[in-house]
Amino acid sequence: MAGRGCLELGLFCWVLLAVPVGPQPASSVPGAPLTTLTPPPQSEASMLSLNLGLNFKFHLRGPAAVWGSPVTETHPLSPGLGQESEEDLEGDLRTDPLWELLVGSPGNYVPEWGSAEGSFTPWASSLPPESTSPLSGPTKRPTAPSQPRMSTVTWATALTATAPPTSAPRPRQSELELKFDVALRAGAAPTLGHRSLPLLPSLRASLAEIAGRLGPFGFFGTTLSPLRNFSSQSYQGTTAQPSFASEVSDFPGLFGTTGSLPPPLLERKFSSPSPLDSVASPSSASIKTTPVQHDPTVSTSDPDELSPASFGSPSAQPGCEPGSCSEPELSDDSGQPPASPLPLFFLTLEADWAEARARWGLAWEAHVYGAGALFGLVALLALLSLALLPWRCPPGAPCLALLDLLLLSAGTTRAFPLFYDAYGHRDRLPALAWLLLQDLPLPCLAAGLGLACLLLARPRTPRCPIGLAALLLLGLGLAAAAALGSAVHRPLRPLRLASRGLHAFLAAFLSGLLLALSCWGGRRRRAGAPLGGSGFKGATPVPQVRSPFAPRESWRRAARTAPVAGTFGLLSGALQGYEVLHALGYGGQTGLEGPWPWWAFQLGLRLGEVGVALPLALLGLYPALCSPRVPRRCWAKLFRLSPGHAAPLLPGGWVPGIRDKEPLGSAIARGDAELLQLCALAGPGPDLLLQGGSCPGFEGARANTTQSPASSPSSDCTVDFRPPSPINLRRSIEEALCSEALLAPGLFQGPAFGDALSGLGLYRTISLGNKTGAGPSEKSEKVPGSPAPPELPSPGAWPPGSSASSGSLCGLSRDSSSMLLCSSPDRPPRCPLVCVLSPPRPSESSPSLPASGSYQALSPPSRDSPEHASELQAEEALLQEQFLDACRQIDELSMGSDTIDL
């Protein structure tokens, strides 16, 4: 709709500039508001009137002249000429920035803002400080000389002025003067006695109109309290600067100040008028305006303290009565209702404190202190979560940290103005700071909703995707650019309206998505699958990092905050969207005026934002406080180079001693992954997969036992499984053994971390080469707890309730410094013998055990108590037979080494 309107607008601008036109009269009734959409004839200049389907009207006056050249012209206004339309006076004293963008700037001047829709007299402004302000009124009009001005262009509706017939024409202009009026209305024309509301709302919202309603401090802009409209008196003669409007106009503006202002209510002085920009709220009363330049030395004061000389307006009198000033003011005792509704609740908390306490009582304090305390609580929860994240470091910590930062920003930027602005200390901060304080919380909350959707939707580790990151940067950039542009250049203030609309839409959309995710909780997939089943392809297995809400119970608890945040997010987005529509002329309803609707709307906005921020803060705090599994500390991660931190412990020459013989195919390069040995360190030590070497106490065991050269820890590690060719055979066997039969952490009590690292070595599996001919009867004798041969001492029975039967394939060491391969309890192990290093464990029941750590062989029956050992002897023998058969098949299918040599 907006694009089509702009297209039609440009087309008719071209028609106006290309076609010579003639005059077209229009009739009106003197002394009454304008009741037709056709403006009265203003001069002998030519005029073109086009009445289109939706009542577009364009007026072109003046002979052909050079565009953009300044024109000096004076309009002597006498009581006889005082019946001239206010549109011409408005056109003489206003400049429209939109037309300046269309046809070019006629000179170096600062554009001011036009009147609001339906106001009988617009609050006008002109560049020269010595120019005077016209006094509005349909009956009597004093003479006010107009100073030389630039060529002006206006965009206003025909309903903003009265239309008495002129008795004398103005002098012809020597330059072209273009007046461009647009009125888009539907329905019958209003009657003569009063204005009737259109069937369709006005779409005549130019950039100047919108910018005039955009306060510099947000959607609740630096406007006055609605209490000022409910005074018993109405004071005239207030000065309407670009930053302040004393009385009310007739547009249901979102950023409007309120009606007649009694003197005791304006007690705050603003050092600079530039940070303030207010437009009056609708009323039938007129406004007396005085155009001024942006002068930081001029301060807005009370209505009784107006100085006509300071503003160059001899007619702006503080004590002017309605009769003497010729202003048709509708007072309270006039008995005539206002011409349009007064939506006065789109304002900031800028009422006088004593007056607000008298009007609202406890509700005022609840509004200020209650909402401020809730936003402060949000900031404290976010700060606590940020402090706990480095110590707990749950999965998805970067995403949680970003969520906490956004909530901390939103909470502080909302709590600070509520406490700071209520006492009127706004002049202590620059305008840009206040603009950022008002505009940044909305994109932060919208981005927080997006992160909450990401945390609850992804089953794996949440990572900020490119789309969400771009959306976050776009929202923050648009809000910051709108705030900066509004503080620097006034015509850019409509960007803040676009920013508000975008974030209102995003908040509503993401809130609906969050509600959908909370309802979809029963169908949610499991958060990641455990490792296993295919073996490891690297030297050290990397654990799969899961979502901070991976367990179903944790996800259900976290998802309870989603409906609350989604509901309040929809409420906040709807209210913000209604603000944007109201700024464009929609949504004004009778009965919404007054202090209590204003207070209720403000409180609803604050509660909507708190209802979004507080559940999100609890969502970000839950993984840091209520994580079901204590994760590794982030500080430990900082000192580890990579997940494969144990890889440097497995260099290429991992056997420290001299090998008995060189393995076949040694010229083939081997990676570190192939050097992963099939032994684990038992006990609570580091559980690291260490490289070869001697073991403290193992020499004593070697002295008492006779081991084969193959089973020596310093001998060749591959003598038992050396095939005719080394093509993938070593890796195949290691994968087969590592995937099922390694032990879980914490199965035996072992030395401390420092003691274990001193001399522990890495050993290999028990040599099976000398057992190929052994029958099941021979192998069945090796039962835990029974007297064992010296070379294979039994570790004894595992205590009941130990973690031998639990754990996953991949686990953590006891000091959380490494990864350990764990056994799979639900499958029978495929490797019957796994070598471990047990700690010194003196035991009377097993005198064959050495006094220190020994090289032991664990068999599957050792998982159970000795009572069940006899039942598992046959199973152990069968497993060993299957293992040896698999080794023989591998040897048969392997390629000969002589082929490789060729």
Swiss-Prot record:
What does the record say about its membrane topology?
Answer: Multi-pass membrane protein
Spell out the Low complexity composition-biased ranges.
Answer: 125-139, 799-811, 843-854
> PTM Phosphoserine: at which residues?
S642
Is this entry keyworded Kinase?
no
Highest taxon, organism lineage: Eukaryota
What residues form the membrane-spanning segments? 371-391, 393-413, 431-451, 465-485, 501-521
Under which name does UniProt file this protein?
Proline-rich transmembrane protein 4
At the highest ranks, the source species' classification is: Eukaryota, Metazoa, Chordata, Craniata, Vertebrata
Q: Which gene encodes it?
A: Prrt4
